[in-house]
Amino acid sequence: MKTVAVVGSQWGDEGKGKVIDFLATQADVVVRGQGGNNAGHTLVVDGKKFALRLIPSGILNSNTINVIGNGIVFDPKGFFEEIEMLESNGISTKNIKISDRAHIVFPYHKELDGLAEEARGDNKIGTTKKGIGPCYMDKTERSGIRVCDLMDKEIFAKKLKLQVDAKNKLVTGVYGKEAMFDFDEIYNEFIVYAEKMRPYVEDTTVIVYDAIKANKKVLFEGAQGTLLDLDLGTYPFVTSSHPTSGGFAVGAGVGPNMIKDVVGIVKAYTTRVGEGPFVTELFDETGDRIRTQGHEFGTVTGRARRCGWFDAVIVKYAARVNGLTSISFMLLDVLTGFDKIKICTAYKMGDKIVNNFPASLEDLAKCEPVYEELDGWHEDITKVEKFEDLPENAKKYIARIEELIGVNVDLVSVGPNKIGRASCRERV
């Protein structure tokens, strides 16, 4: 491992935390460069779970520097809740670095997130109402407030006043509500955060660049998934950032050639949270069984995830747009006990066979899965430690997916625990 990016290759919730946790133990630097505290990742240490949203996964390793990069939208309140949770469990937080270029999520972003979703009526996009989208809107509009602004009281006061006035006009003029944002209240709250944040704030682009040039091991930690990418995902049912390998480079402030390997995290089946077309979605007992066996409920929201068979069209697309160099195949054990397992190898839209993932959601909604059926397995695989010890039908399933995607599966997750949960092929 030198520089590795870990990217979700479906709609998120693929089990990235397991692989990131595994790789973070070897990393000198772990970087998060996109999203905010809308996407959760769970780490397990000695049977204890730590649900993190902003802080990188290397935090459990005392010698690892954990970078919250310039591409993050930073929620100070959520950040310090995580700090308190970690420190109360005896975990040091001194090795966290926050980019001075990261944009800040304010209370008005969260309120506007909820108002906008409510106004959509039947056309909701499934926002987590964490203020992520509105914060990125301010960033794109070039009116946002960054961490470096918060570090200067006068600059912060000037910019916050403009924003509070603008947001109150938006609330009254567009949503027909009374003005709800108070400058003094927000200013006083965030000035306290500023002083608490100050020891963590640096130009993180220098930290990441210097680490790579010194041949240190750097892990780019992805959140969410490829199909939630603002440009490349199932728009508009996407997030407001770029959870793809190209987005990681921008969000960390380094050139794309500095990321040598891109590991795609792929669930052995397909899940999705929220709205939008889902070609292989199962509405029967099989879908319920996958959901139950896979414990498919959101880390942050608790929402039940929609479940379906493996969609090779999606993952082949993700492999292409991310430049995947390998795949980590997660939650294979969830499929244990099925007599037959299906793989979606293409879509059918009317009389037409579709092999590439459509841009148009209207087209995607018309697509039906073209399935290939394989024999399942009934052996317990949760204690398997070597790839060759997997049941033959499980190995055939993986081999067929490698063939369809064109990328090697180098890591297979076979259970919930850190020890004995993964079987690595010899080439890893």
Give residue spans per PLM region.
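Non-transmembrane, aqueous-exposed alpha-helical and coiled segments at domain scale
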Residues: 1-423
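Positively charged, low-complexity/disordered segments
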Residues: 425-428
